[in-house]
């Protein structure tokens, strides 16, 4: 169990970091398929060991936090994801669960089945039939305002066709996609212009939709299909999902013709079989079908779980397979020193993407496959998205193949490695002396869920470490303008913003700090438990095994990891320096006398100049505030930035206390 728990936490930390790079920084360091493979692995492990599932796991959250370059949109009805299944048996189990919940016995349920588009989920808000706002899914609760870009998509009506039944307000949900023809045209143009080419149509659609300049989006030939509704203000609502889709068509909204009303499980399986056959002829990428209980009243009865509805599920299409060649095996060093083998492949095109890498995850996998460099292998996309080496085609093996030699020294720093036979891993023993481990540790330290140093991306950290400007987290807080402006793509303005962000990060929560310093097996949830119990770093550093194991989710192994961390003189020195007056990290707490916001219902309006909306919300939640999306008599406080809207007017009418941005920062004590 120990090894499983450690492995699960490693997967979570890696996925959180990749989320931060991909969604918050627009700087992915792995392909989508590598990311999705890891997510699928984590879901499976949490299914097998449900006691190890935590509320802060990436499997319990959707997508990403909205970026600062777009205005934030709060989804009043969350945009949830879907659970996935991969075989008929799993679907029959789903059908049985639904019938049992509805007390249907052996009677047939009716379903509406649609395509599962491989694109970007968006929300379109229409008021009296006029498009007034469009937003991305984001993390399911807060998305990005992409209204101007959505207006450039020809298939999306700016005004619904009036049939006398248009609701006062309706939120249409659907998927923005890029067709295969549009994708080829985009990459051919990019090749001629020597500009960035996209790996697959989904990435191209995402990048196109999130352009700051809508005129660029307009050239990308995006398409849209709607599949559902969020908020709807109308007395007349269709009784079934299929009727809702038909109503969308009447209003002029694009709805896929590949949808089917199914009575009972067999008709659903027949539709799945049909889609499997026509998939290659669609002209755009899909990765399965979506199966929804058709009756809306039954959907309401079934409700939701943490991140998905109970009344719908995605049945993924089978993995595509191709033959390719192992050109080399490289070794990557992670934050904890674990060395992971990665197969470099002769690029092969599978299901809309070029695949050139496949993680082998452990050296035991190389042994299991009997893999040699130069071998021909079968590679498939598990779940239609994750690159996986299935087996070696031994009959095609030539005399030119060579064995995979396990590293005796770290491929990055040259230090000796040690083997953990129990966990079947090879580990670099150098710690932060190894530049690879140092880089990964620092990237974790500055990440959004940790110290949240906005603008301190992976590329900047790589440069700072390579130039030996920083050697530990303390050095981040000693950076000056001269050191930063000498870096690539760092001008005066960007440097000033980064230095401001570093200064701002000194005010954090104790829980974030504990998560940031990288104690083995201490994720966000356990860090929060430790922070709540000990209140301050000095108390935690003096803790013993007895007090640690009294805390929720802290067993002997995790407690030992905490003790070992604080018995390390190097770690102690770094923490003491970070908390010293010279660096000045301070912990916010709901127990501080500066607790102006605790327990208050707060609404934001307008744009903040110094903090992003997301950062401000995180700070207030840490101080015990409750963030609301709309103004009502129950609101205690409105925080107003620039370019305020109707919320400010309504707050004045209701005589709600209003504070401007400067006063907000003054109360927080960060400016």
Swiss-Prot record:
Gene3D superfamilies per record: 5' to 3' exonuclease, C-terminal subdomain, 6.20.10.30, BRCT domain, DNA ligase/mRNA capping enzyme, Helix hairpin bin, Nucleic acid-binding proteins
Binding residue positions for Zn(2+): 410, 413, 428, 434
Assigned EC number: 6.5.1.2
Superkingdom per UniProt: Bacteria
PROSITE patterns associated with the record: BRCT, DNA_LIGASE_N1, DNA_LIGASE_N2
Reaction catalysed by this enzyme: NAD(+) + (deoxyribonucleotide)n-3'-hydroxyl + 5'-phospho-(deoxyribonucleotide)m = (deoxyribonucleotide)n+m + AMP + beta-nicotinamide D-nucleotide
Annotated keywords: DNA damage, DNA repair, DNA replication, Ligase, Magnesium, Manganese, Metal-binding, NAD, Zinc
GO MF terms, alphabetically ordered: DNA binding; DNA ligase (NAD+) activity; metal ion binding
Keyword Ubl conjugation: no
Domain BRCT, residue spans: 592-671
An example Gene Ontology biological process: DNA replication
Record bears the keyword NAD: yes
Pfam family, one: DNA_ligase_OB
One term under GO cellular component: cytosol
Coiled coil residues, start to end: none
Active site feature: 116 (n6-amp-lysine intermediate)
Cofactor: Mg(2+); Mn(2+)
Residues holding NAD(+): 32-36, 81-82, 114, 137, 175, 292, 316
Enzyme class: ligase
Alphabetical list of NCBIfam families matching this protein: dnlj (TIGR00575), PRK07956.1 (NF005932)
The family this protein is said to belong to: Belongs to the NAD-dependent DNA ligase family. LigA subfamily.
Physiological role: DNA ligase that catalyzes the formation of phosphodiester linkages between 5'-phosphoryl and 3'-hydroxyl groups in double-stranded DNA using NAD as a coenzyme and as the energy source for the reaction. It is essential for DNA replication and repair of damaged DNA.
Protein name, entry field: DNA ligase
